[in-house]
Structure formats: structure tokens, C-alpha cells
């Protein structure tokens, strides 16, 4: 697997988180499978490939790849504006997080604790999701620049939805970190759009 392809998988996961946050904020519902995929990526240890972080199947990131393609194609009619806004905000927050070694250590310690919880309850249990959400609240949401989620207030005010949104933002920022570790940069999204799309279309076809 080429480096650009690995970068795209990680970037697609950022957009997958963004798309799920948007859907949850607007409708109050998302499927358990994509939620589990993104939460599982937070606990992935020593994966054989980037795709293995996300369950080993590009179909798990299909909505993210679609949202990323719409951003790169720049067609006003198909652009998914809110997912794009969330994704760019996650990339920005990850850069701020990178300067905070103390916070990275804390997140790592807290994720170790969640991993033990998962063994008892399962990955998408509300207690586990609440723990992921509290990590986000105690760390990333303390930055001056925060991610403002827009949607239907009836859904956003439900505590379980708020927890899932925070957990998904944490997963998206983890994927943003992986993307940058693989050599990804925001300049590529500006100056290498055609090359990225050529790599992305086969992933969209599964």
C-alpha cells in the first residue's frame, strides 16, 4: 500500500468521524457499526496496516471517503459543508494537541483505562462511550478553539448523543494525528487535489 493511500485512509477516517457527528447532530441516530469502528480505532495497538486501525475494510469508512471526495472535488452541489468544517477543525485541534506532551500522556493513560472497561462492557456500551467523551471534555475541549457542532437542539441536548459526539471527535482527532504521522499535510488538500482524488476513487468503489 502506497504512502498516499495510507494517508487517505487516515484522512478518510477524520471525515468519517465528521460525517457521523453531523448525522448524529441532525437526526439523533447513527448505526452502531460505524460508531464501533471509530471507537475501536482509539484502542488499536500495533496494527499491521493503516486500514487495520479501522477494521481492515475500506467500506467501514465509505461515508468519510464520500465527504472527503466532495471536499476535494469542490462542486458546490455535492459539498458536505458541516462535515468539512468539523474535519478541518479536528485537523487544527490535533496540531494544538501535538504541542502538549502532558495532555498526550494523559489521553494515553485514560485510554488504557477505557480498554479495561471495554473488556467488561463492550465497545459501544454507554459507560464506555461516556468514558471516551470525558477524555475529550477533560483535554481537547479545554483549548481556546473548540468545535461548535450545529444540528437539531432536540438531539444535541440528549446526554447520550452529546457523549457520542464527543467520543467521535476524539476518534477523529486521533485519526488526524495518524494522518500527520503518515506524512499528511493540509497543503496536499490544496495543491494535490487531483492526485488525492485519483487515489481516493478506488477506495470509494471498495
UniProtKB/Swiss-Prot annotation:
Domain of life: Bacteria
Subcellular location: Cytoplasm; Cell inner membrane
A Pfam family that the UniProt record links to this protein: DUF489
InterPro entries on file: HflD, HflD-like_sf
Record family assignment: Belongs to the HflD family.
Keywords (A to Z) from UniProt: Cell inner membrane, Cell membrane, Cytoplasm, Membrane
Gene Ontology CC terms, in alphabetical order: cytoplasm; plasma membrane
Gene: hflD
Membrane topology: Peripheral membrane protein
Name of the protein in question: High frequency lysogenization protein HflD homolog
Amino acid at each position: 500500500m502506497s504512502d498516499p493511500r495510507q494517508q487517505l485512509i487516515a484522512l478518510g477516517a477524520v471525515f468519517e468521524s465528521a460525517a457521523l457527528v453531523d448525522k448524529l447532530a441532525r437526526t439523533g441516530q447513527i448505526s452502531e457499526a460505524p460508531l464501533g469502528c471509530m471507537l475501536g480505532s482509539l484502542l488499536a495497538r500495533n496494527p499491521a496496516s493503516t486500514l487495520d486501525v479501522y477494521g481492515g475494510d475500506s467500506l467501514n469508512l465509505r461515508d468519510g471517503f464520500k465527504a472527503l471526495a466532495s471536499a476535494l472535488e469542490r462542486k458546490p452541489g455535492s459539498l458536505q459543508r458541516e462535515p468539512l468544517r468539523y474535519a478541518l477543525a479536528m485537523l487544527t485541534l490535533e496540531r494544538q494537541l501535538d504541542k502538549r506532551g502532558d495532555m498526550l500522556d494523559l489521553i494515553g493513560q485514560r485510554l488504557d483505562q477505557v480498554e479495561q472497561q471495554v473488556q467488561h462492557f463492550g465497545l459501544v456500551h454507554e459507560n464506555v462511550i461516556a468514558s471516551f467523551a470525558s477524555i475529550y471534555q477533560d483535554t481537547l475541549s479545554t483549548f481556546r478553539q473548540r468545535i461548535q457542532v450545529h444540528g437539531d437542539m432536540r438531539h444535541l441536548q440528549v446526554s447520550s448523543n452529546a457523549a457520542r459526539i464527543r467520543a467521535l471527535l476524539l476518534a477523529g482527532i486521533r485519526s488526524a494525528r495518524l494522518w500527520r504521522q503518515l506524512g499528511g499535510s493540509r497543503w496536499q488538500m490544496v495543491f494535490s487535489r487531483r492526485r488525492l482524488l485519483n487515489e481516493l476513487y478506488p477506495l470509494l468503489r471498495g
